[in-house]
Amino acid sequence: MNPTTKRAIKEIVVYALAFGCSWYAAHKLLSTLDPYRQKRQDTVSKSRKRLDEWAGEQVKELETLELNEYEQIVASQLVLPSEIDVSFDDIGGMDEHVNQLLQDVLFPLKYPEVFDTHGGLLSCPKGLLLYGPPGCGKTMLAKALAKQSQATFINVSVGLLTDKWFGESNKLVDALFTLARKLEPTIIFIDEIDTFLRQRQRTDHEAMAQIKAEFMSMWDGLLSGQSRVLVLGATNRPADIDEAIRRRMPKVFSIPLPNAEQRRKILELYLKKVPLEANFDWNGVVNATAGLSGSYIKEVCRSALSVPRRELFDKHGNDLEAIKYDIQSGGLRSLKTEDFYHYESLQNVSGIDVE
């Protein structure tokens, strides 16, 4: 090998090493300067753990699941069926809604081979909207549906799909739907959907407009296929949702304030393990809670039960050991009807003047 060739090879090696070192140094420097680097690493680590748990519960092979970086970020929002502590049995006064959800949504989602007949008219809808006043059980219904169906549940927040870098949000929206298809049957749940997919206006920021457009485009991909992915939204302001979004949610359930019969069932559900006086006036309490949502009724029950508890504190002067012994030995008296008419039990919770 002549000297000229040797010199050329040496120069090539030196340039290659210099380029490699420069690239590595620049990469490390940019990674260090990136304020979201650690957050992304933590998110990916969390998503891997969630996917391992998901694979264990769904009895599926995780090795065959290929996810990109954005799908891993979305996977961090997975909620496992075993983590949901709500079932349809825990929801009082909604028998009609539960039956409709079972027949129109859950069974077609869980058994597509039975319902994907008649031109797909009996298949699971791709969109479902629950609307009604706050505290009436919309989120509980969504969780119970995921629990009962054993479907993959992705809890979507606006923060998950928004990124300060141009184009990143669109990739996250794409990842949401591609991941949902890979893990189907899947329920994509968006609470307070009106804050994210509200009516489009000329004053909307360009980035948010692109996110909405990408969301609807990917959603249309579900509508044209046989995937078992359901977009489930909950809101107390349905009129604020974009018309194009509402069109993609053919199933709409109104969850109003409970009537007298429903309030009775809700009260019975919350008080089923609470000892009551022999002549407890169910009708009186039902009438007193008129106009209250299910969550308010729960607070009324909680506050009513605090009345006999406070009596024990007054009796023992905050002696916790004596109070503990008294409660364990049955010293906590039965709940009385008048406990519900106590100022803190009803007036403070609902704003109703019961005097």
UniProtKB/Swiss-Prot annotation:
ATP binds at G132, P133, P134, G135, C136, G137, K138, T139. The keyword Endoplasmic reticulum does not apply. InterPro entries: AAA+_ATPase, ATPase_AAA_core, ATPase_AAA_CS, Mito_OM_Translocase_MSP1, P-loop_NTPase. Coiled coil: none annotated. PROSITE patterns: AAA (PS00674). GO terms for cellular component: mitochondrial outer membrane; mitochondrion. The keyword Mitochondrion applies. It comes from the Eukaryota. Its main location: mitochondrion. Belongs to the AAA ATPase family. This is Uncharacterized AAA domain-containing protein C24B10.10c. The lineage of its organism: Eukaryota, Fungi, Dikarya, Ascomycota, Taphrinomycotina.
